[in-house]
Amino acid sequence: MKLNNIELSFDNFASEMAKLKNEKHFDYLVTIIGEDFGEEGLGCIYILENTQTNERCSVKTIAKKVDGSDVIPTVINLWKVADLLEREVFDFVGIKFLGHPDMRRLFLRTDFQGHPLRKDFDMSPEANQFPCTDEPEDDFTVEYSLSADGHLVETQKRRFDDDDYVVNIGPNHPSTHGVLRLQTVIDGETVKRIYPHLGYIHRGIEKMWEGMTYPQTLALTDRLNYLSAMMHRHALVGVIEEAMGIELSDRIRYIRTIMDELQRIDSHLLYLGCTAQDLGALTAFLYCMRDREHVLNVMEETTGGRLIQNYYRIGGLQADIDPNFVQNVKTLCKYLRPMIQEYLDVFGDNVITHNRLEGVGPMNLEDCINYAVTGPAGRASGWKNDTRKRHPYDMYDKVEWKEITLTGCDSMDRYYVHIQELYQSLDII
């Protein structure tokens, strides 16, 4: 995948970004990368995508020094996902985004000192005392702007009104699908606003990588998300191999593709099972967990691991596949097809399931793109965003399979997308 690289100055950054969004139709903000460029100063790289043509571009800009602070105009008015992305950059790099309505830390504690992804960050234990007290709480946020004479203005705002009914969810949610805390403002059963608190299991992997060789970094990719360990490592070894000009054999590419799809089945089965569990359907949950065990057993025979496999290497694999791998995968695929229909019979097509999922969590196509809701959730709103189709790698452009999209834009169709993608993964394998 090639990018068109653009560099913008501080003065024309806001207007040129608006042109990229409104005239060039780069409507999807993939990510914002905060960076310490050394003598150049602090800055950001924005990755943008045109969802109609799949064209991508990168935009680099250097922050301006104002009253000792590094500032860049916000793009939250163009892409709503910038709300969290800019807060992440502020948290780790320290760039303040002018006009952002909620410039608080996102991952680290509010009383954390410094910004750890800066090159001059002091890593010594003396400067990073482990806190033994509760994190300070406040209801205020900060917005930064420039005054008429060019000085930085800090404005404090309250997040909650006096009559807001605030309910805290987490940080230890009963379902523990991900450790986070949500401050919600509710009106009856309607959620009016949500303020997320992330980072409870943030381990500073980016900072650790700064002092590692490329082979040493691989062990940490599997731990980014144990439900997609293969894919995370695949992404890293893929860019390293491309940069080094390493050509892989078709055998390695086939094995990686099959392993990725086995991992996808593993992940989707857990999603389907936990959805059933959250609605009280324990039978459907146990069915999914039972079949997920079969998938993990097949991967474990070759990789030696069930969740953390450490299988892909730069330029190849840790080892060849197990002698029984091919036969076991064929047996697994034959077994799973009728089981998927069983999930629908027991849970997915149940009237109670439809009553609880239809119309819940509505998010239309425009909102999905604006908030960068990708994956099966975005495809359930009609967004054709599957990287395997849009930017194919390994053997995904060599096999026939369908990209599943639905238009219900609710939790029910998100469930159905996962179901249909199980069939597609079996077809790819």
Outline where the language-model segments fall:
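Terminal low-complexity/charged segments
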Residues: M1-T190, S267, I352-V360, D367, ...
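Active-site bordering "gate/hinge" segments
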Residues: T110, L146-H177, V185-I429
